[in-house]
């Protein structure tokens, strides 16, 4: 296990030497790749699929920036002591972080202007396009449309909340929290705890999808 206190102590004592030494450790490169990959999966699987928050143009650009950092972390993790692989990882990390911040700031500005009661706040604000342009002309919207094709408007984040299936939320939360606590103290009984929590969660997700499809059908009629 990584000694976090020891790493922090070394960083405070000799910051330059410590940073150079960290770059030669595979763990930190994998940590960057896993962290960014986890955020991409969270944005897609939870916000886009579960909450039906369609990604806008800036959103897919932010995903691309995170994907670049995942790629750089995996490349550098092959051999962190190789100067070429480490340089690729550093360039990807800096490029992804800078571009991610850039698009995040732009999206935040659009969100502020859209939700500002002052109509003059929209002056000069550029909207989002449904035809994204990725660096190097990569047709990511065609290769992976589920992940990189913008289908929403910038600044309009309206998740579909639970309706009649909302009564299952306390059962899901309480059941799974209780199961996690039981997993630490008594793994054998945790199986029965999850037996109550997981089906409730699956049923709530099913009801959410059913309600959403029914609303779409009513709008179409």
Swiss-Prot record:
It comes from the Bacteria. The chain crosses the membrane at residues 27-47, 64-84, 85-105, 189-209. Keywords: Cell inner membrane, Cell membrane, Disulfide bond, Electron transport, Membrane, Oxidoreductase, Redox-active center, Transmembrane, Transmembrane helix, Transport. It is a multi-pass membrane protein. GO terms for molecular function: protein-disulfide reductase activity. GO terms for cellular component: plasma membrane. Disulfide bonds join 56-59, 128-154. SUPFAM superfamilies: DsbB-like (SSF158442). InterPro entries: DiS_bond_form_DsbB/BdbC (IPR003752), DiS_OxRdtase_Dsbl (IPR023792), DsbB (IPR050183), DsbB-like_sf (IPR023380). It is found in: Cell inner membrane. One of its GO terms (biological process) is protein folding. Belongs to the DsbB family. DsbI subfamily. Required for disulfide bond formation in some proteins. Part of a redox system composed of DsbI and DsbL that mediates formation of an essential disulfide bond in AssT. This is Protein-disulfide oxidoreductase DsbI. It comes from Lelliottia amnigena. The gene is dsbI.
């Amino acid at each position: 296990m990584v000694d976090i206190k020891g790493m922090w102590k070394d960083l405070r004592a000799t910051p330059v030497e410590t940073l150079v030494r960290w770059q030669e450790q595979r763990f930190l490169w994998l940590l960057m790749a896993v962290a960014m990959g986890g955020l991409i999966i969270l944005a897609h699987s939870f916000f886009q699929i579960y909450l039906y928050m369609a990604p806008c143009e800036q959103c897919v650009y932010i995903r691309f920036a995170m994907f670049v950092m995942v790629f750089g972390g995996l490349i550098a993790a092959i051999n962190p002591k190789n100067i070429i692989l480490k340089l690729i990882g550093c360039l990807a990390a800096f490029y992804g972080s800078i571009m991610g911040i850039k698009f995040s700031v732009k999206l935040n500005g659009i969100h502020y202007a859209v939700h500002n009661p002052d109509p003059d706040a929209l002056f000069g604000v550029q909207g989002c396009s449904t035809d994204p342009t990725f660096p190097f002309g990569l047709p990511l919207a065609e290769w992976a449309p589920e992940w990189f094709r913008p289908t929403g408007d910038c600044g309009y984040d309206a998740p579909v909340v639970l309706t009649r299936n909302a009564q299952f939320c306390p059962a899901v939360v309480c059941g799974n929290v209780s199961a996690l606590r039981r997993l630490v103290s008594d793994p054998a009984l945790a199986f029965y705890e999850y037996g109550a929590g997981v089906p409730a969660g699956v049923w709530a997700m099913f009801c959410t999808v059913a309600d959403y499809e029914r609303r779409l059908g009513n709008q179409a009629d």
